[in-house]
Amino acid sequence: GIDAENVDEVILTHAHFDHVGNLHRFPKATFWMQDIEMQSITGRDMTHPFLRQAYHQEDVEALVRLVYQDRMRFIAGDGTFAPGIDYHLIGGHSRGQMALTVNTERGPVFLASDAIHLFEEVDQELPFFVLYDMAVMLEGYRTCARLAGDRSFLVPGHDPLVTQSYPAAKPGLEGLVLDLGLSLIHI
């Protein structure tokens, strides 16, 4: 496994509570997120209770503290984070929702994060109930499918099929840490 205390870089695909908790466990890390996501969670968008419900105030405060500790870096739009890791601004689920393409032994794997929660969202253009902008979310499904190319290279953020489709990174981590460079079945 990886010791969180030794992690240097963390990419935050968005700032919902289920994705930014436990930032304190990474004391040496520099964090990266879309600039528009930080603007959204610290600005006018949060005056709307509906938009605010997916964020915990203490998490937002922790993100702002990282800015003041010079441990937050902002990116905008699409680009390359490091060789073999590209980021894509998708939006929809949150204002700054992004996804990643990571090169693996079997080819580029598209990590959708919450741009796609479940395969059925993309298959049926079925919007997820937690969203910032439905039209952007629906268009994002098409963008994600295009960027992934083959469905077997698409990894939605919360679909149980993912844990059934990829092996554990090592014994004892089944369902928790997966080896996305290998696929057990064609999804």
Predicted segments with their positions:
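Metallo-beta-lactamase
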Residues: 1-2, 6-8, 36-89, 135-151
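Active-site metal-binding loops of divalent metal-dependent hydrolases
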Residues: 15, 36-37, 92-94, 113-115, ...
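Active-site gating loops and adjacent loop-to-helix segments of metal-dependent hydrolytic enzymes
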Residues: 115-125, 170-181
